[in-house]
Amino acid sequence: IWATVTNFGERPGINGKLQRFADEVYRASNSEYAKYMKGVGILPEGINNNPVTYELLLELVWHKDRVDVDQWIESYVTARYGRITDEIRTAWKMMLKSIYSSEVGYQEGPPENILCARPALELKSVSSWGRLAKKYDRDLYKKAAFLFAKAMPEFNEVRTYRIDLIHFLRQVIANEADSVFYDMITAYQEKKVEKFEQEVSRFLMMIDTENELLAQDPFFRLSTWQQQAKDAGNTAAEKKNNFHNLMMLITYWGEHVTSEDNLHDYAYKEWAGMMNTYYKERWLVYFDYLRALLRGEEAKAPDYFHWEREWVEKNLHMADDAPRMSLEEIVNKVTDR
């Protein structure tokens, strides 16, 4: 079986080397080993992201000829949204040249979001085996996402469009947060207090903006998954255990032993109800620590190992993650319209 692992821990983010997937399956099925090849499969640790990747991979087995993804994407988009427009078509073609391009190199799942990282002055990943670096053309991707958003008046009632719109704009925020973080840390290191506070405010505002964006659909709300965890239990004890396990898995993933600390954020989630609580609160703890150092005080570095576990125990309840704005309002805010 030709297969690929495209996701670890069902971590969020957009990625998929679509043309490379198509070319590699075609190459394998026409090689000297073709007689041993019995099919095409997917091996992700979660499938609630990047649907285009799975749609393509699981369709390839039915194609004898090489698939040109630039052409294939039109049929995919038409099927996903019920119809296609010039704006939608152009936006997706731009994504094929940016976020869905076949960049060279190995990576374990999508590039990550620094807003969700355990705070530090230097950050290269959120999870231990992930990466923050985005190697595609981020400016082109942003243009594609904003163009996709322009179709909202026509596609607002199509849920698959809304889910993709939220996901695409969420990625724009994640991408731009990298530079805000850099400016913030630079200001701290240069002891420019006023500039540091300005960038901290921008950083926290990005967390709040993303939280409101994600709240626009139940698919991106923590409460949706909390309810599923509870519903999977048959008894009160099972429901309670499932609920705790969910909150543990999406935060620190482990027991109360420091040797397991490398699994923190392995299955981090960008969900409404997580962005404005867990991730924001963790950053606030860090910013207070940096402020103390800027004042010349002796301050103890945050103990995230215990803080994360205490946070889970204090938040074993349904999240308050309902939207406060309309989808149109938050989309206009993200796209500066």
Give the ranges of each region predicted by the language model.
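Mature N-terminal, pre-catalytic/accessory segment of carbohydrate-active enzymes
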Residues: K150-R337
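Catalytic-core regions of glycoside hydrolase
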Residues: I1-L96, Y100-G105, G109-E112, C116-R138, ...
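Long, amphipathic alpha-helical regulatory blocks in the mid-to-C-terminal portion
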Residues: K135-V158
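Generic detector of short, locally flexible boundary/turn motifs and exposed helical patches
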Residues: W2-F8, F148-A151, Y161
